[in-house]
């Protein structure tokens, strides 16, 4: 087999080199010119195509090699891209897990702190919206008593007007009216003293308010 392959290769070289030797001998005997040199170059390129090394096999081999290299590069790039994406996903998942765990622990600790805190002492609301301290003061108490005394004096005056000036003239024939009047007269010293005290206090407080304000 080796001998037959060697014989075939020698025959191919003889066939290819025969026209080239003939061409060289003819070109040496002939006169050189621009056209003959151009034709000789074309013939040389044509004969080189049928040389000992098969051009088709070289082209096919080169093409297959480049295609394989391109495929390998694409596969490598895809594998690197997949590795990068996987690394980014793992980092994001780790960050998400850490963030959720931190939030969970923070909420638990916040609940524990709120449960362990002592209740704050609630202060009393002010009796007047103009006060800055939430506790009863003398000014507010005096103002409240002044208003109460004014209302009391108004009620006593209106009740006396109705009982002694109007209802007596109308209800002279009703015995129940005289009973109410009799019981009212028994409480009259207490009512009179309270009314006098309220009148004095209201007068003094009103005068003081007018002078100061």
Swiss-Prot record:
Pathway(s) annotated for this protein in UniProt: Carbohydrate metabolism; tricarboxylic acid cycle
UniProt key word Cell cycle: no
Gene Ontology MF: a single term: metal ion binding
Coiled-coil region(s): none
Cofactor requirements of the protein: heme
Cysteine-cysteine disulfides: none
Subunit structure as annotated in this protein's UniProt entry: Component of complex II composed of eight subunits in plants: four classical SDH subunits SDH1, SDH2, SDH3 and SDH4 (a flavoprotein (FP), an iron-sulfur protein (IP), and a cytochrome b composed of a large and a small subunit.), as well as four subunits unknown in mitochondria from bacteria and heterotrophic eukaryotes.
The protein, known as: Succinate dehydrogenase subunit 3-1, mitochondrial
Keyword flag NAD: no
Annotated transmembrane regions: 148-165
Function according to Swiss-Prot or TrEMBL: Membrane-anchoring subunit of succinate dehydrogenase (SDH).
Subcellular location: Mitochondrion inner membrane
Entry's Gene Ontology cellular component terms: mitochondrial inner membrane; respiratory chain complex II (succinate dehydrogenase)
Originating organism: Arabidopsis thaliana
């Amino acid at each position: 087999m080796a001998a037959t392959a060697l014989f075939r290769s020698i025959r191919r070289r003889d066939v290819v080199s025969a026209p080239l030797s003939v061409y060289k001998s003819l070109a040496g005997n002939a006169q050189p010119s621009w056209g003959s040199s151009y034709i000789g170059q074309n013939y040389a390129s044509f004969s080189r195509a049928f040389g000992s090394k098969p051009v088709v096999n070289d082209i096919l081999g080169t093409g297959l090699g480049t295609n394989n290299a391109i495929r390998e590069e694409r596969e490598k790039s895809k594998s690197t891209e997949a590795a990068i994406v996987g690394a980014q996903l793992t980092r994001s998942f780790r960050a998400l897990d850490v963030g959720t765990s931190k939030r969970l622990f923070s909420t638990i600790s916040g609940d524990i702190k709120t449960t362990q805190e002592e209740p704050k002492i609630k202060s009393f609301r002010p009796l007047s919206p103009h006060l800055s301290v939430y506790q009863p003061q003398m000014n507010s108490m005096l103002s409240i008593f002044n208003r109460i005394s004014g209302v009391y004096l108004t009620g006593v005056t209106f009740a006396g007007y109705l009982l002694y000036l109007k209802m007596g003239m109308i209800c002279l024939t009703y015995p129940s009216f005289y009973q109410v009047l009799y019981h009212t007269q028994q409480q009259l010293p207490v009512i009179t003293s309270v009314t006098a005290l309220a009148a004095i206090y209201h007068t003094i407080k009103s005068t003081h308010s007018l002078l100061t304000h």
